Amino acid sequence: MRVVFQQCTKFSTSCNRAFLARFLKPVMNASPKEHVVKQLLKPVGLNVPPRPNIKYSEGNSWLDLFDGAKTEERIKELEIEFAKSGMYEMATFRKTNGKLFLSPESYWKADKALYFPHLSGRTLSSEDHGNVEDVLRGKTSVIRVFSTQVGDKISREYIKNTELGIDNYENQSCQVIDINFLENKLKSWLFKLSLNNLKSTVPVQRHDNYWLCHREQIPFLMRERLLINNVYSGYIFVVDPNLKIRFMACGPASADEFNKLWKVVGQLSKEKK
Protein backbone atom coordinates (compact mmCIF):
# COMPACT_ATOMS: atom_id res chain seq x y z
CA MET A 1 0.00 0.00 0.00
CA ARG A 2 2.86 2.34 0.89
CA VAL A 3 4.53 1.62 -2.47
CA VAL A 4 1.34 2.47 -4.35
CA PHE A 5 0.98 5.68 -2.35
CA GLN A 6 4.59 6.67 -3.09
CA GLN A 7 4.11 6.00 -6.79
CA CYS A 8 0.93 8.08 -6.84
CA THR A 9 2.71 10.89 -5.01
CA LYS A 10 5.59 10.84 -7.50
CA PHE A 11 3.14 10.83 -10.42
CA SER A 12 1.21 13.74 -8.92
CA THR A 13 4.39 15.72 -8.27
CA SER A 14 5.71 15.15 -11.79
CA CYS A 15 2.34 16.18 -13.27
CA ASN A 16 2.32 19.36 -11.19
CA ARG A 17 5.85 20.18 -12.31
CA ALA A 18 4.98 19.59 -15.95
CA PHE A 19 1.81 21.68 -15.61
CA LEU A 20 3.74 24.49 -13.91
CA ALA A 21 6.55 24.33 -16.47
CA ARG A 22 4.07 24.90 -19.30
CA PHE A 23 2.90 28.15 -17.73
CA LEU A 24 6.40 29.31 -16.80
CA LYS A 25 7.46 28.86 -20.41
CA PRO A 26 6.16 32.31 -21.47
CA VAL A 27 8.34 33.96 -18.82
CA MET A 28 11.41 32.08 -19.98
CA ASN A 29 10.73 32.85 -23.65
CA ALA A 30 9.85 36.50 -23.11
CA SER A 31 12.65 38.04 -25.16
CA PRO A 32 11.23 41.13 -26.91
CA LYS A 33 11.91 41.68 -30.59
CA GLU A 34 12.99 45.08 -31.80
CA HIS A 35 10.02 47.13 -33.00
CA VAL A 36 9.91 47.75 -36.74
CA VAL A 37 7.90 50.70 -38.05
CA LYS A 38 5.79 49.64 -41.03
CA GLN A 39 3.09 51.25 -43.12
CA LEU A 40 -0.43 49.99 -42.55
CA LEU A 41 -1.82 48.01 -45.46
CA LYS A 42 -4.55 45.74 -44.11
CA PRO A 43 -7.60 47.16 -42.30
CA VAL A 44 -7.38 47.44 -38.51
CA GLY A 45 -10.27 46.50 -36.24
CA LEU A 46 -12.60 43.73 -35.11
CA ASN A 47 -14.73 41.36 -37.16
CA VAL A 48 -17.95 42.03 -35.23
CA PRO A 49 -19.59 45.40 -34.56
CA PRO A 50 -19.64 46.82 -31.02
CA ARG A 51 -22.75 46.28 -28.95
CA PRO A 52 -23.81 47.23 -25.41
CA ASN A 53 -22.80 44.96 -22.52
CA ILE A 54 -20.34 42.94 -24.61
CA LYS A 55 -17.38 41.78 -22.52
CA TYR A 56 -14.21 40.85 -24.37
CA SER A 57 -12.65 37.75 -22.85
CA GLU A 58 -8.99 37.36 -21.99
CA GLY A 59 -7.20 34.09 -21.33
CA ASN A 60 -8.73 30.68 -20.76
CA SER A 61 -11.55 29.44 -18.60
CA TRP A 62 -10.79 26.74 -16.02
CA LEU A 63 -12.08 24.03 -18.35
CA ASP A 64 -9.85 25.31 -21.15
CA LEU A 65 -6.82 24.39 -19.05
CA PHE A 66 -7.53 20.78 -19.93
CA ASP A 67 -7.74 21.55 -23.65
CA GLY A 68 -4.23 21.11 -25.06
CA ALA A 69 -4.75 23.27 -28.14
CA LYS A 70 -6.29 26.18 -26.22
CA THR A 71 -3.65 25.98 -23.51
CA GLU A 72 -0.86 26.06 -26.08
CA GLU A 73 -2.49 29.04 -27.76
CA ARG A 74 -2.74 30.86 -24.43
CA ILE A 75 0.94 30.15 -23.71
CA LYS A 76 1.89 31.81 -26.99
CA GLU A 77 -0.29 34.78 -26.09
CA LEU A 78 1.42 35.11 -22.72
CA GLU A 79 4.84 35.05 -24.37
CA ILE A 80 3.85 38.14 -26.36
CA GLU A 81 2.41 39.83 -23.29
CA PHE A 82 5.45 39.19 -21.10
CA ALA A 83 7.81 40.29 -23.87
CA LYS A 84 6.11 43.68 -24.23
CA SER A 85 6.56 44.98 -20.71
CA GLY A 86 6.40 48.60 -19.59
CA MET A 87 10.15 49.03 -20.13
CA TYR A 88 9.80 47.71 -23.68
CA GLU A 89 6.98 50.17 -24.36
CA MET A 90 9.03 53.09 -23.05
CA ALA A 91 12.12 52.09 -25.06
CA THR A 92 10.02 51.69 -28.20
CA PHE A 93 8.34 55.05 -27.69
CA ARG A 94 11.68 56.80 -27.25
CA LYS A 95 13.11 55.13 -30.34
CA THR A 96 10.13 55.93 -32.57
CA ASN A 97 8.95 59.15 -30.89
CA GLY A 98 5.53 57.49 -30.80
CA LYS A 99 5.39 56.85 -34.54
CA LEU A 100 4.79 53.10 -34.12
CA PHE A 101 3.42 52.69 -37.65
CA LEU A 102 2.80 54.79 -40.73
CA SER A 103 -0.76 55.55 -41.76
CA PRO A 104 -2.12 53.88 -44.92
CA GLU A 105 -1.80 55.60 -48.29
CA SER A 106 -5.58 55.84 -48.56
CA TYR A 107 -8.65 54.97 -46.52
CA TRP A 108 -9.94 51.40 -46.30
CA LYS A 109 -13.00 50.61 -48.43
CA ALA A 110 -16.26 50.05 -46.56
CA ASP A 111 -16.60 46.41 -47.62
CA LYS A 112 -13.09 45.61 -46.35
CA ALA A 113 -13.00 47.78 -43.22
CA LEU A 114 -13.28 46.31 -39.72
CA TYR A 115 -15.13 47.55 -36.65
CA PHE A 116 -14.21 49.86 -33.79
CA PRO A 117 -14.49 48.07 -30.42
CA HIS A 118 -17.17 48.48 -27.78
CA LEU A 119 -16.17 50.87 -25.02
CA SER A 120 -18.11 52.21 -22.08
CA GLY A 121 -17.34 55.03 -19.70
CA ARG A 122 -18.40 58.52 -18.68
CA THR A 123 -17.93 61.95 -20.21
CA LEU A 124 -16.72 65.16 -18.62
CA SER A 125 -20.25 66.52 -18.79
CA SER A 126 -22.01 63.64 -17.04
CA GLU A 127 -21.34 60.99 -14.41
CA ASP A 128 -23.78 58.64 -16.13
CA HIS A 129 -22.25 55.52 -17.65
CA GLY A 130 -22.67 55.20 -21.41
CA ASN A 131 -21.46 53.37 -24.51
CA VAL A 132 -19.13 55.15 -26.90
CA GLU A 133 -20.63 53.45 -29.97
CA ASP A 134 -23.97 55.13 -29.24
CA VAL A 135 -22.48 58.53 -30.09
CA LEU A 136 -20.55 57.19 -33.10
CA ARG A 137 -23.44 55.51 -34.89
CA GLY A 138 -24.73 57.46 -37.88
CA LYS A 139 -21.87 59.99 -37.91
CA THR A 140 -18.36 60.28 -39.28
CA SER A 141 -16.03 60.45 -36.27
CA VAL A 142 -12.38 61.30 -35.71
CA ILE A 143 -11.40 59.58 -32.47
CA ARG A 144 -8.35 60.41 -30.38
CA VAL A 145 -7.19 57.64 -28.01
CA PHE A 146 -4.52 58.34 -25.39
CA SER A 147 -3.49 57.41 -21.85
CA THR A 148 -0.77 59.94 -21.02
CA GLN A 149 -0.15 63.66 -21.33
CA VAL A 150 2.37 63.12 -24.12
CA GLY A 151 -0.12 60.88 -25.96
CA ASP A 152 -2.76 63.57 -25.55
CA LYS A 153 -0.41 66.23 -26.89
CA ILE A 154 0.83 64.42 -30.00
CA SER A 155 -2.58 63.06 -31.00
CA ARG A 156 -3.99 66.60 -30.79
CA GLU A 157 -1.66 67.54 -33.67
CA TYR A 158 -4.07 65.73 -36.02
CA ILE A 159 -6.92 68.00 -34.96
CA LYS A 160 -5.28 71.40 -34.52
CA ASN A 161 -2.55 72.72 -36.82
CA THR A 162 -1.23 75.94 -35.34
CA GLU A 163 1.01 76.66 -38.35
CA LEU A 164 -2.00 76.60 -40.68
CA GLY A 165 -4.32 78.13 -38.10
CA ILE A 166 -6.71 75.16 -38.40
CA ASP A 167 -8.83 73.86 -35.53
CA ASN A 168 -10.85 70.87 -36.70
CA TYR A 169 -12.70 70.53 -33.42
CA GLU A 170 -15.09 72.89 -35.20
CA ASN A 171 -15.15 70.85 -38.43
CA GLN A 172 -18.72 70.44 -39.69
CA SER A 173 -17.98 67.24 -41.66
CA CYS A 174 -17.44 65.09 -38.57
CA GLN A 175 -17.42 64.94 -34.80
CA VAL A 176 -14.19 64.72 -32.81
CA ILE A 177 -14.23 62.26 -29.90
CA ASP A 178 -11.55 62.22 -27.19
CA ILE A 179 -11.04 58.91 -25.35
CA ASN A 180 -8.81 59.17 -22.31
CA PHE A 181 -7.84 55.62 -21.35
CA LEU A 182 -7.51 55.10 -17.60
CA GLU A 183 -4.75 52.50 -17.25
CA ASN A 184 -5.55 51.14 -13.82
CA LYS A 185 -7.51 51.68 -10.62
CA LEU A 186 -4.89 54.06 -9.22
CA LYS A 187 -5.10 56.36 -12.24
CA SER A 188 -8.88 56.15 -12.11
CA TRP A 189 -8.83 57.22 -8.45
CA LEU A 190 -6.43 60.08 -9.18
CA PHE A 191 -8.67 61.25 -12.00
CA LYS A 192 -11.63 61.44 -9.67
CA LEU A 193 -9.61 63.70 -7.39
CA SER A 194 -8.48 65.96 -10.23
CA LEU A 195 -11.62 65.88 -12.37
CA ASN A 196 -12.44 69.54 -11.82
CA ASN A 197 -8.93 70.49 -12.89
CA LEU A 198 -9.28 68.40 -16.05
CA LYS A 199 -12.63 70.02 -16.83
CA SER A 200 -11.02 73.45 -16.57
CA THR A 201 -8.36 72.53 -19.16
CA VAL A 202 -10.84 71.16 -21.71
CA PRO A 203 -13.17 73.66 -23.43
CA VAL A 204 -16.75 73.30 -22.20
CA GLN A 205 -18.09 72.66 -25.70
CA ARG A 206 -15.96 69.50 -25.86
CA HIS A 207 -17.09 68.00 -22.53
CA ASP A 208 -19.89 65.94 -24.11
CA ASN A 209 -17.42 64.17 -26.40
CA TYR A 210 -14.56 63.77 -23.94
CA TRP A 211 -14.73 60.21 -22.59
CA LEU A 212 -13.01 58.55 -19.64
CA CYS A 213 -12.82 54.79 -20.24
CA HIS A 214 -11.00 51.98 -18.45
CA ARG A 215 -8.28 50.57 -20.70
CA GLU A 216 -8.74 47.08 -19.22
CA GLN A 217 -12.04 46.74 -21.11
CA ILE A 218 -9.95 45.79 -24.12
CA PRO A 219 -7.68 42.80 -23.37
CA PHE A 220 -3.97 42.90 -24.19
CA LEU A 221 -4.11 40.87 -27.40
CA MET A 222 -7.08 42.84 -28.68
CA ARG A 223 -5.14 46.04 -28.08
CA GLU A 224 -2.31 44.45 -30.07
CA ARG A 225 -4.72 43.80 -32.90
CA LEU A 226 -5.97 47.38 -32.74
CA LEU A 227 -2.35 48.65 -32.58
CA ILE A 228 -2.98 50.71 -29.43
CA ASN A 229 -0.93 48.82 -26.85
CA ASN A 230 1.86 51.33 -26.33
CA VAL A 231 0.53 53.45 -23.50
CA TYR A 232 2.83 56.40 -24.20
CA SER A 233 1.74 57.19 -27.76
CA GLY A 234 -1.48 58.70 -29.03
CA TYR A 235 -3.75 57.23 -31.70
CA ILE A 236 -6.22 58.52 -34.26
CA PHE A 237 -9.12 56.58 -35.79
CA VAL A 238 -11.48 57.73 -38.51
CA VAL A 239 -14.71 55.79 -38.01
CA ASP A 240 -17.62 55.85 -40.44
CA PRO A 241 -21.35 56.03 -39.54
CA ASN A 242 -21.49 52.20 -39.54
CA LEU A 243 -18.78 52.01 -36.84
CA LYS A 244 -16.07 50.80 -39.22
CA ILE A 245 -12.47 52.00 -38.99
CA ARG A 246 -11.58 53.60 -42.31
CA PHE A 247 -8.24 55.21 -41.44
CA MET A 248 -5.71 55.19 -38.60
CA ALA A 249 -2.62 57.11 -37.53
CA CYS A 250 -0.40 57.45 -34.47
CA GLY A 251 2.39 59.55 -33.01
CA PRO A 252 3.22 63.09 -34.13
CA ALA A 253 1.36 64.34 -37.22
CA SER A 254 3.37 65.29 -40.27
CA ALA A 255 1.85 67.84 -42.64
CA ASP A 256 1.17 65.02 -45.09
CA GLU A 257 -0.65 62.89 -42.49
CA PHE A 258 -2.67 65.86 -41.26
CA ASN A 259 -3.87 66.63 -44.78
CA LYS A 260 -4.42 62.96 -45.60
CA LEU A 261 -6.62 62.42 -42.53
CA TRP A 262 -8.90 65.37 -43.29
CA LYS A 263 -9.07 64.40 -46.94
CA VAL A 264 -10.39 61.01 -45.77
CA VAL A 265 -13.00 62.77 -43.63
CA GLY A 266 -14.13 64.74 -46.67
CA GLN A 267 -14.38 61.59 -48.78
CA LEU A 268 -16.46 59.82 -46.12
CA SER A 269 -18.79 62.80 -45.95
CA LYS A 270 -19.43 62.38 -49.68
CA GLU A 271 -20.15 58.66 -49.10
CA LYS A 272 -22.96 59.59 -46.72
CA LYS A 273 -24.63 61.60 -49.46
Curated annotation (Swiss-Prot):
It is found in: Mitochondrion inner membrane. One of its GO terms (biological process) is mitochondrial proton-transporting ATP synthase complex assembly. One of its GO terms (cellular component) is mitochondrial inner membrane. Keywords: Membrane, Mitochondrion, Mitochondrion inner membrane. Its main location: mitochondrion. GO terms for molecular function: unfolded protein binding. InterPro entries: ATP10 (IPR007849). Belongs to the ATP10 family. Involved in assembly of the mitochondrial F1-F0 complex. This is Mitochondrial ATPase complex subunit ATP10. It comes from Candida glabrata (strain ATCC 2001 / BCRC 20586 / JCM 3761 / NBRC 0622 / NRRL Y-65 / CBS 138) (Yeast).
